[in-house]
């Protein structure tokens, strides 16, 4: 099975139950939803493969995309911190506490010249992590965190923002919860993404693109 003419061929030795798509850089570019991806998503759903979304975005940012695509899968937001499977009647679940990353961002604002601890606009809806605006020298943020009382905080650049997350909080942890709710074996799932924050879910599933 091909995702598209320009993408890799998926292994056909298993019957895949689900494809989980990252959003920014995978489903969307800076101009919006990639037109080819709309066709691919709808074709997958017609063929009985559930499409779900896993993103660093907040639920209010992801939900309109999910609805516009008319997909039957769930949402994993905030890099695994939020899980919502409305199609199956499951309530929204917050899997982490974002207060410590937010406090770390405030501290970083006192250490790195020009860094705005308020971060990106969507932080107003963010519950389980904190996001700084994308900066060229994100390693300076990482190095400052590693040598501070906030050394347990992970610093993850995505190309769109720099995420501050607590230990054990990643796309794999959220995806694992969402899959358990549906009784889906992770090894029968394909994950697609393009950034370092996608690596944990790649390691969880049966095939990664």
What kind of region is each of these model predictions?
Residues 1-21, 184:
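Non-catalytic pre-domain segments flanking phosphatase-related domains
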Residues 12-31, 202:
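Asp-based phosphoryl-transfer active-site loop
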Residues 30-123:
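Active-site phosphate-binding/coordination module
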Residues 50, 207-208:
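Residue-level detector of anion-binding/catalytic polar loops
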Residues 104-205:
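Conserved acidic, metal-coordinating active-site core of Asp-based
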């Amino acid at each position: 099975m091909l995702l598209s003419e320009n993408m890799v061929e998926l292994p056909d030795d298993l019957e895949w139950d689900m494809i989980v798509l990252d959003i920014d850089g995978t489903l969307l570019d800076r101009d919006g939803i990639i037109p080819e991806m709309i066709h691919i998503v709808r074709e997958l759903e017609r063929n009985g493969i559930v499409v779900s979304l896993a993103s660093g975005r907040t639920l209010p940012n992801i939900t309109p995309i999910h609805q516009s695509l008319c997909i039957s899968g769930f949402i994993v937001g905030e890099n695994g911190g939020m899980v919502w499977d409305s199609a199956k009647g499951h309530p929204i679940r917050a899997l982490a506490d974002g207060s410590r990353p937010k406090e770390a961002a405030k501290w970083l604002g006192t250490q790195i010249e020009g860094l705005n601890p308020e971060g990106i606009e969507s932080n107003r809806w963010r519950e389980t992590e904190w996001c700084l605006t994308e900066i060229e020298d994100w390693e300076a943020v990482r190095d400052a965190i590693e040598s501070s009382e906030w050394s347990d905080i992970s610093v993850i650049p995505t190309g769109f923002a720099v995420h501050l997350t607590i230990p054990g909080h990643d796309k794999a942890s959220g995806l694992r919860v969402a899959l358990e709710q549906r009784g889906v074996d992770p090894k029968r799932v394909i994950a697609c993404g393009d950034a370092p924050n996608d690596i944990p879910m790649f390691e969880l599933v049966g095939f990664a693109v």
